[in-house]
UniProtKB/Swiss-Prot annotation:
The modification Phosphothreonine is found at residues 637, 645, 823. Glycans are attached at residues 68, 77, 226, 237, 308, 332, 377, 412, 441, 460, 532, 537, 547. The active site is at 773 (proton acceptor). It comes from Arabidopsis thaliana. One of its GO terms (biological process) is stomatal complex morphogenesis. LRR repeats lie at residues 40-63, 75-94, 95-118, 120-142, 143-166, 168-190, 192-214, 215-238, 239-261, 262-285, 286-311, 313-333, 334-357, 359-381, 383-404, 405-429, 431-453, 454-476, 478-500, 501-525, 527-550. The chain crosses the membrane at residues 583-603. Residues 26-582 are extracellular. The kinase domain is not required for ligand binding. This is LRR receptor-like serine/threonine-protein kinase ERL1. Belongs to the protein kinase superfamily. Ser/Thr protein kinase family. The lineage of its organism: Eukaryota, Viridiplantae, Streptophyta, Embryophyta, Tracheophyta.
Amino acid sequence: MKEKMQRMVLSLAMVGFMVFGVASAMNNEGKALMAIKGSFSNLVNMLLDWDDVHNSDLCSWRGVFCDNVSYSVVSLNLSSLNLGGEISPAIGDLRNLQSIDLQGNKLAGQIPDEIGNCASLVYLDLSENLLYGDIPFSISKLKQLETLNLKNNQLTGPVPATLTQIPNLKRLDLAGNHLTGEISRLLYWNEVLQYLGLRGNMLTGTLSSDMCQLTGLWYFDVRGNNLTGTIPESIGNCTSFQILDISYNQITGEIPYNIGFLQVATLSLQGNRLTGRIPEVIGLMQALAVLDLSDNELVGPIPPILGNLSFTGKLYLHGNMLTGPIPSELGNMSRLSYLQLNDNKLVGTIPPELGKLEQLFELNLANNRLVGPIPSNISSCAALNQFNVHGNLLSGSIPLAFRNLGSLTYLNLSSNNFKGKIPVELGHIINLDKLDLSGNNFSGSIPLTLGDLEHLLILNLSRNHLSGQLPAEFGNLRSIQMIDVSFNLLSGVIPTELGQLQNLNSLILNNNKLHGKIPDQLTNCFTLVNLNVSFNNLSGIVPPMKNFSRFAPASFVGNPYLCGNWVGSICGPLPKSRVFSRGALICIVLGVITLLCMIFLAVYKSMQQKKILQGSSKQAEGLTKLVILHMDMAIHTFDDIMRVTENLNEKFIIGYGASSTVYKCALKSSRPIAIKRLYNQYPHNLREFETELETIGSIRHRNIVSLHGYALSPTGNLLFYDYMENGSLWDLLHGSLKKVKLDWETRLKIAVGAAQGLAYLHHDCTPRIIHRDIKSSNILLDENFEAHLSDFGIAKSIPASKTHASTYVLGTIGYIDPEYARTSRINEKSDIYSFGIVLLELLTGKKAVDNEANLHQLILSKADDNTVMEAVDPEVTVTCMDLGHIRKTFQLALLCTKRNPLERPTMLEVSRVLLSLVPSLQVAKKLPSLDHSTKKLQQENEVRNPDAEASQWFVQFREVISKSSI
């Protein structure tokens, strides 16, 4: 009995010690966590549950994960919380930690040496912060560590050789720092290392032959350092490599022959000083998807055997000194999307076999010595988006079959020997945004069809032999930013229609034979910063408006009869002409008689018309048809509107669109309205036009601008909309209002509102409606920055039984779905592509197209390099509390802009993801009246965790976000 009592007492004591030990450990870990929190800054609404007074259960704290048995802290995940401050040395007191993830914050200071005390650590990610100083040697004490990610900080010093003492290290990523010194050869003897990322540092030394000792290494990236020497001859022994990137260093010598033994998918050697020939053995590397040898000093011909690379999608050989012809065998590279051979010394003709490359997206052959014509077979490259042969010796004419290149946006044939007329068929390449035919021998007149290229940004026809008049149709180029027709033989007057071009930056007309006056209408081109009309035969007064004072006098020289303040010449009478001949006098007399007859007829008809109009006031009112669609405008007449706006005086103008001018009208006893005056008069099918307006007017949604009514008159068709106090999203991001800072919460609110409006059109309207021109300038913002979709002047209803509609060109350059550009068929997925571009604008603050830069292509290239976050607008990163939301929004934007429309989400799914990023309280407070489809999503989100819902949705579309897969 006594022995039993002793055993019981002993057992209770042991349990007591265990409980005390656990409690003591939890107490110590709780103190460590509070010390870690104390070293952070920018904690607004963050880590509120880290409170050891009111919540002692530290395992329930945000980002803290505990072991199920010992209840010790084993994982700390505070990634993408926008945390500032430093990493506390107290982190070393969490001895049982297996994972630390602090990436995507703004942590500064040095990495504490105490982190080496976390002996159980397997995963350490401190990337994308502001950490500086050396990498602590204490990290080498972490014998269980498998992943060390310190990329994109400001770390200095060498790569510690002691990292080789971590026996289980599989992934080492130190890219994007300021590390110096050589890469330790000991690092190459880590048998388990699989991923080595050292790009974007200042490392020196050479590539060691020991690099192939890493038998498990598949990713080797030292891009953008200061490495010298040659590529080791033993490079062919690196048989495990899948990605090999040694680009943008100072590597010299020739490419080793045995490099062909590699089985890499990506071989990037560009931006070095490599010499010699391209080894033919590269043509045997069947796994190659990307081959980049550009910007070196390679010589010799392009090996025809490269045509065997049937899986290669990108071939970059530009910026070398390659000679010889372009091998016709390249036409066998069936998956080739990018072929850049520019800036070499290639000769011969363009092989017709390139026309077999059905997936070719970009073909750049500029700055070589190519001769002969452009093969008409090139028009068979249905996906071709960019074609550049600038700076060659090509001749002949432009193939008429180019009209079939519906996806082409960039065409540069400048500085060659092309001749003949510019074919009218170029006007059928509807998606062109840059057309450069300068520096050739084109003759004849400029085709009027070029005025149909409504998405054109740059038109350069300079230095040719073009004659005839400058087409008035150029006034239809609503998106144009630059027109250059200098150094030709053009005659006639400067068309007044050019004054309609609201985006025009440069108008270069010098060295022609233009006559007449400079149109006053050009003063309406408020964005015009470069005007050159020198050396023509212009006369009269230079427009005296003040905005013309920004042009230098040199812009007007060489026109003897031009005068005005801007050119320093006082206007006086023109020189007396010589005495008229007898024949001239007879012609003048006959002309005067004819003119008098015409005036008499005009006066007579006018009097007859007045008699008809004076018949009754009711008939007079019939000339203008006013239709009120909502009762809030019913008390007003057309005369009220004209009186308030002084017959649409220009002082009431608040904006210009591609098809209209917009005025503000402040009516009494009602809210202000926006009046959109369409450029076109009565449409061909008036009944269809009115039916469409009535359909648009029937749409009532909090995120769609309401059409209150319309007026049809001979003086112009007017549409009456809600007036939006904060203008358009484009104005706030890119225009004169961009001084208004948009924080992340406001941008997300705008994205959610626009998505809900578009989802309503796609899923809740009967028949459903496709907007067809989603862009930032068509997203208007009220006084509360609530988004409203506008500009349904081109939207059409689609019967429920149809899945697509064929129509004329719609949309705006930079937002147009490439699939629509290729097939001319449009559906809901086209709107979703455009919405994805708007999301990218919100995230980056950049324009969809800026000069020649394309925002979508920029983000794709950064996705390739995993540097997308570098493109984020600073105002977003400063105000976003969870950078993970930004990454999700980038993912969503890239999914919306997938090349294959079938892989894009629906607007319901887009709304679901965006709503999941809005805190639940904000959703409840700021989105009180939702449409039916959005309410269903809200109900789902009440049942399930929003983040989990978003995660489930992303799983459905799971894949690596990279250029090759989008």
